[in-house]
């Protein structure tokens, strides 16, 4: 069955459509939504079966982790005990916004966190009351979708709900930065350019390979 498209342009039905999408997430379904960059696909971050399904639908390698969308920057402390100064500076400057920060975890794995600056996804996170595991709305290796019709074209009956908020604001993906204590590396160039990152950090750290 083709995904249900929920139009968010009508303020009278906006809240109800957010609830419909939230209920879909809570029942293990995949939901597409606009962000301030491109359209994303998401599932509840605490649902392992839904995450497996998202990888399958996306045709994404398990080596490439999903981003975790959080509604408040303070939630970073739920994932890492020590937040490097570099991360604190970037969070203070660019969050909420189009920046994904990858941090080390105690078990030697990593987590990519993003605090988006888009009403729809923020309302959705707050409605489900858990972080959302997310990836761009395209088959792995393809171009990210920038509107609801492109999402449908990419996935059709493979996902469950599409929140149609009109064209994505930036049309380019978020910038992804891996952070160590005093070093960072740009993993993916995106909306926030290298120069803006450098100005923010004021040469207090070293950039490697970017």
Regions found by a protein language model. Give the residues of each.
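Active-site-adjacent structural elements in enzyme catalytic cores
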Residues: 1-210
């Amino acid at each position: 069955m083709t995904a249900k498209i929920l139009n968010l342009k009508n303020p009278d039905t906006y809240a109800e459509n957010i609830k419909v999408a939230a209920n879909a997430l809570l029942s293990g379904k995949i939901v597409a939504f606009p962000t301030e960059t491109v359209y994303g696909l998401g599932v509840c971050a605490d649902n392992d079966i839904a995450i497996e399904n998202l990888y399958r639908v996306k045709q994404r390698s398990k080596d490439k982790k999903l981003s975790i969308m959080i509604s408040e920057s303070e939630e970073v402390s739920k994932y890492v005990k020590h937040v490097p100064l570099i991360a604190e500076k970037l969070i203070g400057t660019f969050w909420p916004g189009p920046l994904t920060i990858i941090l080390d975890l105690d078990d030697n794995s990593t987590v990519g966190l993003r605090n988006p600056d888009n009403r729809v996804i923020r309302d959705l996170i707050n409605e489900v009351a858990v972080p959302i595991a997310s990836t761009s709305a395209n088959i792995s290796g393809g171009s990210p979708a920038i509107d609801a019709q492109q999402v449908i074209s990419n996935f059709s009956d493979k996902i469950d709900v599409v929140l149609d908020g009109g064209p994505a604001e930036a049309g380019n993906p978020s910038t992804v930065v891996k952070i160590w204590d005093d070093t960072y590396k740009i993993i993916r160039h995106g909306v926030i350019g290298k120069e803006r990152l450098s100005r923010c950090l004021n040469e207090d750290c070293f950039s490697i390979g970017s």
